[in-house]
From Swiss-Prot:
Keywords: Cell projection, Cilium, Cytoplasm, Cytoskeleton, Flagellum, Repeat
CC annotations in GO: axonemal A tubule inner sheath; axonemal microtubule; axoneme; centrosome; cilium; mitotic spindle; neuronal cell body; sperm flagellum
Location in the cell: Cytoplasm, Cytoskeleton, Cilium axoneme; Cytoplasm, Cytoskeleton, Flagellum axoneme; Cytoplasm, Cytoskeleton, Microtubule organizing center, Centrosome; Cytoplasm, Cytoskeleton, Spindle
Name of the featured protein: EF-hand domain-containing protein 1
SMART domains in alphabetical order: DM10, EFh
Function recorded in the entry: Microtubule inner protein (MIP) part of the dynein-decorated doublet microtubules (DMTs) in cilia axoneme, which is required for motile cilia beating. Microtubule-associated protein which regulates cell division and neuronal migration during cortical development. Necessary for radial and tangential cell migration during brain development, possibly acting as a regulator of cell morphology and process formation during migration. May enhance calcium influx through CACNA1E and stimulate programmed cell death. Overexpression of EFHC1 in hippocampal primary culture neurons induced apoptosis.
GO molecular function terms noted in the UniProt entry: alpha-tubulin binding; calcium ion binding
Tissues where the protein occurs: Expressed in adult brain including hippocampus, cerebellum, cerebral cortex, thalamus, hypothalamus, amygdala and upper brainstem. Expressed in soma and dentrites of pyramidal neurons of the hippocampal CA1 region, pyramidal neurons of the cerebral cortex and Purkinje cells of cerebellum. Highly expressed in testis, trachea, and oviduct, moderately in lung, and slightly in brain. Highly expressed in sperm flagella and tracheal cilia (at protein level).
GO biological process: flagellated sperm motility; intracellular calcium ion homeostasis; mitotic cytokinesis; mitotic spindle organization; positive regulation of apoptotic process; regulation of cell division
Region (Required for its localization in the mitotic spindle and interaction with alpha-tubulin) residue spans: 1-45
Lineage, uppermost ranks: Eukaryota, Metazoa, Chordata, Craniata, Vertebrata
Keyword Cytoplasm found: yes
Length: 648
């Protein structure tokens, strides 16, 4: 509530009074809506409800009202009703401005193009001022195309402003996300809309051509000299003349492949080729006659056409350097047509006569292409695992249910209960094994060997069966073709290797001698002499031999029997002389290596070479005498007797 001074009284305390009728002291409202539009009116009432005089009509307005204006006579003009308010998202719904543009893309690594021109369409959506960039899809372009920039509001500058349709026009550059688009044209609706808004459009431009696309559209220049060949003459001369060839297509190298027969027709009138398949009865194939229709066959293609599959390539004259002709079809030579290789093995009589007259080929012999039976497959046995006999193990590879190997029944009946027994010593560097003796039993019926060691009291070695009855393979025999020990390998001084153990035959019984005499053809003369002399020899006293060597008296070569006796006595003397000396154990194997014929002899040069390699004291007097006794004939030395002197 306020106080107002009374007119004519000074504004002093006591001269102002409060108007109790005034109850509203708010400011008058001047903002309002009329027909959907915001309007402003002048305030007419002040605070407290007092009328404002300074917001009334001006003097000019009062003068105008005072005039006799038509409005005083006819009244105020009626204003047209305002249009109904329509929001922008409704007014511009589905209204899009379309601009045609392009941008230039650099191609850094290419010898054929340095840049390419890509066409795009820029769409401006009036309802929310958003934009999008879409590139029309070009078939087989090899470039990811379609929507380049999704619909959004494009940033105009760093201040955060966005592009508006007032900023778009023809002939301007539009930079979005670092990529510059050149707007060259727009559609009819866009042109009408911009002109209706008072925007003057620039003239339209043309999109520049892409250099690589234009290069590909240009035809390949091919400078061909017109041929003087008369095709009409060829047609009239060779009409109804066809060369017939018989060929095969061998596809047996591939999975489920087979060899199929074909007939190749070459038409001389136009140099075309036709391939027909020869069907057999009940071959399981559809009896379609043609494999390849009649057409010209390319022989040499241009470089670019070689990388394309031949089976789907539509051949044209620009892609072919050379075509197949009649001289390319020769009997006995392969021919590749559309990636498939045919072998021509025969032709008809007319074709032979044509090649004889045209190319001077008098003889075109047919080639035999009948399928030959493959050679039988040799069954290969797996490697021997060392268990049991090889013959027994091999039966597992011959049948699902193994059978016992066949036996020589005649041999078993003739040699039943015939056993050859030998006394042998074990060659071993262990001193306790030097005095061990073994009895070898060779069973002639089955060629098996058993070894028995007689027990010796207080020897510390359990005697008895050393090896059960079995076949023994020689150490140097191959695994796939084993060689077993036979009776001819057993004689005095022979070394028998049984599963890594080396035995030296020392003695035998009278039955072995009788068997060797009755089967002398199986043994060498040295083997027969060694066993016979071993049984019948008298001992030569060693002191007498020593006296002969000491005095240097020559030993006269007597009979063969006395020579063997002297040799045995000399070997015993060398054993005592070389008792504390040791030599290599492979002395016998070295001699056998150089004895290719297994005769038991080597020449003198080889003999002394081996002795020098193994450090054998050949300069010793006893060794010299041993070499003399072991010499037979001219320059041949029996190394079996020589090695006996060095065995323990």
């Amino acid at each position: 509530m306020g106080t107002n001074p009374v007119h004519g009284l000074p504004f002093l305390p006591g001269s102002s009074f409060t108007d109790s009728t005034k109850t509203a002291f708010h400011r008058s409202q001047t903002l309002n809506y009329r027909n959907g539009y915001a309007v402003v009116r002048r305030p007419t009432m002040g605070i407290g409800g007092d009328r404002l005089h300074y917001n009334q009509l001006s003097q000019a307005e009062l003068d105008e009202l005072a005039n006799k204006a038509p409005i005083l006579t006819y009244g105020p003009l009626k204003q047209a009703p305002l249009a109904e308010f329509v929001p922008a998202h409704v007014a511009f719904d589905k209204k899009v401005l379309k601009f045609s543009a392009y941008f230039q893309e650099d191609v850094p690594i290419s010898m054929e193009e340095h840049y390419r021109i890509r066409h795009v369409n820029i769409y401006y959506y009036l309802e929310d001022d958003s934009m999008s960039v879409i590139e029309p899809v070009v078939e087989n372009s090899g470039i990811p195309q379609g929507k380049l920039i999704k619909r959004q509001r494009f940033t105009k500058n760093d201040m955060g402003d966005h592009y508006h349709w007032k900023d778009l026009n023809r002939g301007i550059n539009l930079t979005v996300y670092g990529k510059t688009f050149r707007i060259v044209d727009c559609d009819r609706f866009t042109q009408d809309f911009l002109e209706s808004q008072g925007i003057e459009l620039n003239p339209s431009e043309k999109i520049p051509l892409d250099p690589y696309t234009q290069l590909r559209k240009e035809p390949v220049r091919k400078y061909v000299t017109p041929s003087d060949f008369d095709q009409l003459k060829q047609f009239l001369t060779f009409d109804k003349q066809v060369l017939r060839f018989y060929a095969i297509w061998d596809d047996t190298d591939s999975l489920f492949g087979e060899c199929r027969h074909y007939i190749i027709h070459y038409y001389l009138m136009d140099d075309t080729v036709e391939i027909r398949e020869v069907h057999e009865r009940n071959n399981g194939r559809d009896p379609f006659p043609l494999l390849m229709n009649r057409q010209r066959m390319p022989k040499v293609l241009v470089e670019n056409a070689k990388n394309f599959p031949k089976c789907v390539l539509e051949i044209s004259d620009q892609e072919v350097l050379e075509w197949y002709t009649a001289k390319d079809f020769i009997v006995g030579k392969p021919l590749t047509i559309l990636g498939r290789t045919f072998f021509i093995y025969d032709c008809d009589p007319f074709t032979r006569q044509f090649y004889k007259d045209k190319f001077g080929m008098p003889d075109l012999p047919p080639v035999d292409v009948t399928k030959k039976e493959p050679p039988p497959v040799k069954q290969e046995l797996p490697p021997y695992n060392g268990y049991g006999l090889i013959e027994d193990s091999a039966q597992n590879c011959f049948a699902l249910i193994p059978k016992a190997p066949r036996k020589d029944v005649v041999k078993m009946l003739m040699n039943d209960n015939k056993v050859l027994r030998y006394l042998a010593a074990l060659e071993s560097p262990i001193p306790e094994d030097k005095d061990r003796r073994f009895v070898f039993s060779y069973f002639l019926a089955t060629d098996m060997i058993s070894i028995f060691e007689p027990p010796v009291r207080n020897s510390g070695i359990i005697g008895g069966k050393f090896l059960g009855r079995t076949k023994v393979v020689k150490s140097f025999s191959p695994v796939d073709n084993p060689i077993y020990y036979s009776p001819s390998d057993f004689f005095i001084g022979a070394v028998i290797e049984v599963f890594g153990h080396r035995f030296v035959i020392l003695d035998t019984d009278e039955y072995v001698l009788k068997y060797m005499e009755s089967n002398a053809s199986q043994y060498s003369p040295e083997a027969l002499a060694s066993i016979q002399n071993r049984i019948q020899k008298p001992e030569l006293p060693a002191p007498e031999l020593e006296s002969k060597q000491a005095t240097g008296e020559p030993m006269v070569q007597g009979t063969e029997e006395s020579k063997v006796q002297d040799l045995d006595a000399l070997i015993d003397q060398i054993h005592m002389h070389l008792k504390y000396n040791s030599y290599k154990e492979n002395l016998r194997e070295t001699f056998q290596m150089y004895d290719k014929d297994e005769s038991g002899y080597v020449d003198r040069e080889t003999f002394f070479k081996i002795c020098e390699t193994l450090n054998v004291p050949v300069d010793d007097s006893l060794i010299k005498e041993l070499i003399r006794l072991c010499t037979h004939g001219e320059g041949r030395i029996n190394y079996y007797n020589f090695v006996r002197a060095f065995s323990n």
